[in-house]
C-alpha cells in the first residue's frame, strides 16, 4: 500500500493541494522515504544536494507535493525558503546515529520555534529501525525532549525506509491530522 492508497481513505475537498515538507539531517533517509511513498526503487539512492519534489495525484484532483530538502549543514540555512503554506512537517531521524542526537535536537528545536511552522503538525520518522543498534522511538522521545511539546500536534513513528516498514502508519497519522482546507 502506497501513499495514494492511504490518502484515498482521507476525505478532503477536491482541488486541494497538500504540501508536505520533508526535513532532517544528512543521511537520515529522507529521499528513501520519498521514493517509497512514490513507489520507486530505493536500491540506488544518492544524497540530495538541493531538493527533490514529488507531486502525486491522490484522489480526484487532490495533489500531494512532497518537498525533500537536503540535510547537509551547508543546505540547512535554506530550509526556511520552503516554510510557506506547509500542511505537515516530516522530520526524519537516523535512529542509529546517536552521536548526532544533540545536533538533531538543535535543528528540530529551531524548526519548532519557527513562526511560519507554529501550527503545522509534525511527524517524526525514527528511521533505520531495522538496525539492531538503533534507538527506539521512546528513547528518541526522551533524548529530544519531545514530551515537553504541549502546544503542537506531533507524533513519532518508528520506521525503516529501506524495508518500507512504518511509513504508511506515519502517513496515515499525517492524513488524520491535516487541517481542513481553508475556503478562499
From Swiss-Prot:
Main location: Golgi
Gene Ontology molecular-function annotations: GTP binding; GTPase activity
Record: residues binding GTP: 24-31, 68-72, 127-130
Family annotation (InterPro entries): ARL2/3, P-loop_NTPase, Small_GTP-bd, Small_GTPase_ARF/SAR
SUPFAM superfamilies: P-loop containing nucleoside triphosphate hydrolases
Residues where lipid is bound covalently (N-myristoyl glycine): 2
GO biological process: cilium assembly; protein transport; vesicle-mediated transport
Keywords, alphabetical: ER-Golgi transport, Golgi apparatus, GTP-binding, Lipoprotein, Myristate, Nucleotide-binding, Protein transport, Transport
GO cellular component, as recorded: cytoplasm; Golgi apparatus; microtubule cytoskeleton
SMART domains reported in the protein's UniProt record: ARF (SM00177), RAB (SM00175), SAR (SM00178)
Origin superkingdom: Eukaryota
Coiled coil (residue ranges): none
Compartment annotation: Golgi apparatus
Pfam families, sorted: Arf
Family: Belongs to the small GTPase superfamily. Arf family.
Task performed by this protein: GTP-binding protein that may be involved in protein trafficking; may modulate vesicle budding and uncoating within the Golgi apparatus.
Protein name, per record: ADP-ribosylation factor-like protein 3
Organism name: Caenorhabditis elegans
Amino acid at each position: 500500500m502506497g501513499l495514494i492508497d492511504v490518502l484515498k481513505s482521507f476525505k478532503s475537498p477536491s482541488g486541494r493541494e497538500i504540501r508536505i515538507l520533508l526535513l532532517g539531517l544528512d543521511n537520515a533517509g529522507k529521499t528513501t522515504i520519498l521514493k517509497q511513498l512514490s513507489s520507486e526503487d530505493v536500491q540506488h539512492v544518492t544524497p540530495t544536494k538541493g531538493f527533490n519534489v514529488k507531486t502525486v495525484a491522490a484522489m480526484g484532483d487532490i495533489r500531494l507535493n512532497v518537498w525533500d530538502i537536503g540535510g547537509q549543514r551547508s543546505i540547512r540555512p535554506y530550509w526556511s525558503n520552503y516554510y510557506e503554506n506547509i500542511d505537515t512537517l516530516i522530520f526524519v531521524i537516523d535512529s542509529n546515529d546517536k552521536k548526532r542526537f544533540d545536533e538533531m535536537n538543535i535543528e528540530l528545536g529551531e524548526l519548532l520555534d519557527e513562526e511560519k511552522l507554529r501550527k503545522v503538525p509534525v511527524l517524526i520518522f525514527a528511521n533505520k529501525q531495522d538496525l539492531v543498534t538503533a534507538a527506539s522511538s521512546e528513547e528518541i522521545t526522551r533524548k529530544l525532549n519531545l514530551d515537553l511539546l504541549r502546544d503542537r500536534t506531533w507524533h513519532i513513528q518508528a520506521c525503516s525506509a529501506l524495508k518500507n516498514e512504518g511509513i504508511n502508519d506515519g502517513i496515515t497519522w499525517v492524513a488524520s491530522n491535516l487541517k481542513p482546507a481553508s475556503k478562499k
